């Protein structure tokens, strides 16, 4: 269908956005025909038909979307394979052979357009099928489960969970700070029974779902809004953030209601975890004692019971669906302790190197015996000269390092080797989940661009919109649950929209206005537009306040805030030879009249003071700061003249009496009215 649209495009209508590029060109048709035969097209071929100088990044993205709809993949370079004779045989149409002397491969056209570079790199990642999305989602889930299982082997995790339970009971923290409310509440509604063993996704699978038919598919997709932007009376675009949030408020429970519904069950689960952990801690102590003491034993049956109890606790922790911030805090705690252990290990290895002990031999003897109290005695009894040297020269340092290691072991509650294994398991699960999330994000970058294009010309650059949309996409990947049966793109669309509209509301204005105030402004504008149609005129603030059931002062405040800033360089007049800034009073500038009066007062004062004796003139100038940076006290003036302060006071009084004489005062009296 897309190919037919391209072929039927008329020359006079194909270049609405850019007259220099015409989809009906023979070169474009030929390119599409060859691409259909091969099933792919290279970036080089696109660049040849659409030069960077004449085609915008958005047009390139539109063409790439059309090609994708036709089943044509956009790849970095030609798919080539090397023949036995050293030649490179191209697998494209015509089976042309390209002889190469050395390394083959054409250099891609270079461009400094960031949008074009981004689109080129994005085009190299293939789109995911529904099965591919499910496979990646399962990898993310498996990585998270591996990470949670590792955390559950650390006593520090259960100590933290016990603290969180106590803080919840004492209401020091909210339930939303401990668990992911939406994910936990969604699971409780869905009921995971019978869903764990699904190979494919049964039920309401929404393949190729259109947004207008997505009712009930995604949590936030119950009432899809139009993608077309709305404009106010002045032609300015209006953000629809508040509309979308109103929809969310009407269709979703509030966080407080979710907390009230989930808190009893969560506290019950936390109580079970605390009870089981108390048993597990006793078994861990016995297990650790058996590890440290050669005569200690931990039977096979006890080990089986230990593993069973640990598995039950892992299941309980998974049921909680802990908040990502809490999981990250636990991981950071583990990694911090691991860095401390590595620092101690490094100190021990340095001492061994100084004693010329083979590093591999030292590590073999050291690892696994970090908490063994007999290790130093056994190693010092070795006949090798290097070991004897180590304990002769550095025994105190070795004892200090092992004492630090013992403190760490006592704090973590498990053997150091076991702790290292726990950290490795957590790192492995985190790495697997992070890699799977990265693949999911990269495969859906096109979705971000298609949504970001609808929000251009709203105060943010296109690349900024893409960046904010990518942030929303990453949040969608974190929260996506493949078991619900809808496609990832359907769910991610709402996260991307919310991220973009939030950023526009937060960053687009020259003078930043908080998002909640933007929502109130939009609600006020929308109500005003509705009342304009009803009553045939602009509503007054009083009418708006009554309609919205909002205080009148708040309505006036919002209307004042809603005004758009105007540039001081705005042209004024028909000829536009002056700017708005030319007509605005500068409060800091001195008026010419005031400047003339000040200058005249200065000259008159100088002439009047000159009629006094030099001593009297200087005393008055110093006392009142005339012609100086500051005035002076009687004591300071007296020090200048080497007389007492009383004498200065007398001179000052005499000089002021002279100035009051009509022959002098009449010259200054006119300035008193100014």
From Swiss-Prot:
A motif (Interaction with polymerase core subunit RpoC) lies at residues 464-467. Residues 519-595 are annotated as: Sigma-70 factor domain-3. Residues 634-653 bind DNA. It comes from the Bacteria. It holds the Pfam family Sigma70_r2. One of its GO terms (cellular component) is cytoplasm. GO terms for biological process: DNA-templated transcription initiation. Disulfide bonds: none annotated. Residues 608-661 are annotated as: Sigma-70 factor domain-4. Residues 214-252 are annotated as: Disordered. Gene3D superfamilies: RNA Polymerase Primary Sigma Factor, Sigma-70 factor, region 1.1, Winged helix-like DNA-binding domain superfamily/Winged helix DNA-binding domain. Belongs to the sigma-70 factor family. RpoD/SigA subfamily. This is RNA polymerase sigma factor RpoD. It comes from Rhodobacter capsulatus (strain ATCC BAA-309 / NBRC 16581 / SB1003).
């Amino acid at each position: 269908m897309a190919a037919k649209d391209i072929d039927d495009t008329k020359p006079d209508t194909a270049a609405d956005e850019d007259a220099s590029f015409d989809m009906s060109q023979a070169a474009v048709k030929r390119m599409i025909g060859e691409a259909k035969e091969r099933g792919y097209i290279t970036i080089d071929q696109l660049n040849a038909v659409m030069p960077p100088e004449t085609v915008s990044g958005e047009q390139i993205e539109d063409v790439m979307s059309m090609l994708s709809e036709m089943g044509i993949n956009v790849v970095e370079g030609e798919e080539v394979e090397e023949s036995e004779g050293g030649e490179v045989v191209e697998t494209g149409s015509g089976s042309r052979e390209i002889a190469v002397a050395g390394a083959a491969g054409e250099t891609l056209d270079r461009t400094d357009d960031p949008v074009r570079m981004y689109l080129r790199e994005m085009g190299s990642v293939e789109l995911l099928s529904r099965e591919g999305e499910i496979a990646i989602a399962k990898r993310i889930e498996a990585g998270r489960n591996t990470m949670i299982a590792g955390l559950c082997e650390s006593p520090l995790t259960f100590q933290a969970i016990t603290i969180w339970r106590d803080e919840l009971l004492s209401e020091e923290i909210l339930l939303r700070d401990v668990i992911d409310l939406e994910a936990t509440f969604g699971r409780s509604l869905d009921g995971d029974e019978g869903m764990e063993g699904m190979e494919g996704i049964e039920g309401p699978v929404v393949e190729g779902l259109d947004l207008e038919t997505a009712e009930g598919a995604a949590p936030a997709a119950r009432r899809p809004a139009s993608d077309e932007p709305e404009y106010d009376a002045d032609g300015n675009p209006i953000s629809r953030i508040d509309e979308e949030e109103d929809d969310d408020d009407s269709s979703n429970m509030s966080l407080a209601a979710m907390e009230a519904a989930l808190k009893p069950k969560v506290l019950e689960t936390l109580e079970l975890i605390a009870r089981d952990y108390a048993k597990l801690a006793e078994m861990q102590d016995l297990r650790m004692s058996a590890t440290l003491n050669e005569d200690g034993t931990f039977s096979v049956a006890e080990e089986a019971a230990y593993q069973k109890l640990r598995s039950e606790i892992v299941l309980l922790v998974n049921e909680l669906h802990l908040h990502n911030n809490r999981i990250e805090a636990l991981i950071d705690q583990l990694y911090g302790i691991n860095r401390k252990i590595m620092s101690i290990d490094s100190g021990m290895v340095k001492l061994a190197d100084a004693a010329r002990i083979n590093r591999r031999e030292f590590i073999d003897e050291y690892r696994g015996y970090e908490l063994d109290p007999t290790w130093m005695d056994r190693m010092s009894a070795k006949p090798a000269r290097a070991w004897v040297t180590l304990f002769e020269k550095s025994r105190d340092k070795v004892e200090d390092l092992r004492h630090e290691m013992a403190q760490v072991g006592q704090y973590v509650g498990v053997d150091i080797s076991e702790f290292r294994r726990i950290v490795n398991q957590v790192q492995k699960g985190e790495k697997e989940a992070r890699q799977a999330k990265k693949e999911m994000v990269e495969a859906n970058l096109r979705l971000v661009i298609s949504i970001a294009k609808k929000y251009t010309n709203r105060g943010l650059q296109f690349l900024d919109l893409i960046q904010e949309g990518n942030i929303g996409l990453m949040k969608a990947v974190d929260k996506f649950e493949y078991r619900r049966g809808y496609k990832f793109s359907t769910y991610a669309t709402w996260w991307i929209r919310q991220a973009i509209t939030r950023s526009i509301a937060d960053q687009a204005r020259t003078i930043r206005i908080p998002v909640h105030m933007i929502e109130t402004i939009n609600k006020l504008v929308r109500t005003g537009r509705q009342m304009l149609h009803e009553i045939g005129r602009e509503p007054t603030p009083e009418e708006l306040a009554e309609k919205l059931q909002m205080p009148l002062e708040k309505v006036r405040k919002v209307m004042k805030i809603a005004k758009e800033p105007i540039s001081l360089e705005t042209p004024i007049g028909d000829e536009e030879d002056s700017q708005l800034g030319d007509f605005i009073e500068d409060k800091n500038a001195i008026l010419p009249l005031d400047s003339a009066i000040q200058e005249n007062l200065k000259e008159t004062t100088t002439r009047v003071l000159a009629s006094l004796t030099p001593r009297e003139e200087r005393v008055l100038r110093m006392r009142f700061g005339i012609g100086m940076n500051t005035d002076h006290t009687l004591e300071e003036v007296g020090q200048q003249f080497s007389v007492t302060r009383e004498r200065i006071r007398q001179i000052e009084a005499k000089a002021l009496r002279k100035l009051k004489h009509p022959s002098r005062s009449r010259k200054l009296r006119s300035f008193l009215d100014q």
